[in-house]
């Protein structure tokens, strides 16, 4: 895709803020997985798990993750699927 079509960091953060019920920069891991599967590229469960393993900070005690770090890592070192 052309860079213009891929979106930028701010675009991704704005989309994920829709799931940020506490408005504190975190969301449930399951919600992030749902957003990636439903709204983003056509990814299967295995590809999402690979993304999480490569780009995700651990969940906190309540199951929340900081999504801005995830997006930063994903954009700085994209995961390529065959």
UniProtKB/Swiss-Prot annotation:
One of its GO terms (biological process) is mesoderm development. One of its GO terms (molecular function) is calcium ion binding. Residues 7-42 form the EF-hand domain. It holds the Pfam family EF-hand_7. GO terms for cellular component: muscle myosin complex. Keywords: Motor protein, Muscle protein, Myosin, Repeat. The keyword Transport does not apply. Transmembrane segments: none annotated. Gene3D superfamilies: EF-hand. Myosin is a hexamer of 2 heavy chains and 4 light chains. This is Myosin light chain alkali. It comes from Drosophila sechellia (Fruit fly).
């Amino acid at each position: 895709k052309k860079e213009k079509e891929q979106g930028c960091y701010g675009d991704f953060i704005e989309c994920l803020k829709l799931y940020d019920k506490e408005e504190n920069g975190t969301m449930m891991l399951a919600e992030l997985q749902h957003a990636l599967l439903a709204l983003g590229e056509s990814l299967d469960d295995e590809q999402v798990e690979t993304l999480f393993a490569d780009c995700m900070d651990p969940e906190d005690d309540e199951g929340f993750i900081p999504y801005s770090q995830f997006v930063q890592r994903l954009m700085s070192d994209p995961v390529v699927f065959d």
